[in-house]
Amino acid sequence: MRKIGIIGGTFDPPHYGHLLIANEVYHALNLEEVWFLPNQIPPHKQGRNITSVESRLQMLELATEEEEHFSICLEELSRKGPSYTYDTMLQLTKKHPDVQFHFIIGGDMVEYLPKWYNIEALLDLVTFVGVARPGYTLHTPYPITTVEIPEFAVSSSLLRERYKEKKTCKYLLPEKVQVYIERNGLYES
């Protein structure tokens, strides 16, 4: 069985925290690779103004292009409507029956697991990997593998706010992503 990590997210924008988590879990669990899974419409963020799929995908490509063990999975972008992890993983396990998927989530999502759509059936499809995030615990009634990572308190919402306030974001996200954001005037208002 191949071991593949999946890190889902809006990636609005992708930052060094995403890359750090993916890389740490890749090494800790001896994964073959990590797939970044950008969502179309995350159920817990419906109604929020999200940057276009095209821009988020371009930024994610720029952020991951130099790591050969990172790739981008477009499964959720090919569907309309909310992106439920269960639906996505059901499709991926059918397409890749030789893969054991490790679904990587932060502490915020570990606490949210009881509210996930079809969580009991999802547990049959993936192994959840929880990584600590400042302000959250990894306590859950569900079985998860935990991976300790260096604390790096950056979030996409923090970066959007910093751009809106015209503050520097240097060293918080890859330079190529920063250039893309500035050239395209993202997050200015």
UniProtKB/Swiss-Prot annotation:
This is Probable nicotinate-nucleotide adenylyltransferase. The keyword Nucleotidyltransferase applies. It holds the Pfam family CTP_transf_like. NCBIfam families: cyt_tran_rel (TIGR00125), nicotinate (nicotinamide) nucleotide adenylyltransferase (TIGR00482), PRK00071.1-3 (NF000840), PRK00071.1-4 (NF000841). Signal peptide: none annotated. It comes from Bacillus cereus (strain Q1). Keywords: ATP-binding, NAD, Nucleotide-binding, Nucleotidyltransferase, Pyridine nucleotide biosynthesis, Transferase. The lineage of its organism: Bacteria, Bacillati, Bacillota, Bacilli, Bacillales. Belongs to the NadD family. Its EC number is 2.7.7.18. It catalyses: nicotinate beta-D-ribonucleotide + ATP + H(+) = deamido-NAD(+) + diphosphate. Catalyzes the reversible adenylation of nicotinate mononucleotide (NaMN) to nicotinic acid adenine dinucleotide (NaAD). Pathway: Cofactor biosynthesis; NAD(+) biosynthesis; deamido-NAD(+) from nicotinate D-ribonucleotide: step 1/1. GO terms for biological process: NAD biosynthetic process. One of its GO terms (molecular function) is ATP binding. Disulfide bonds: none annotated.
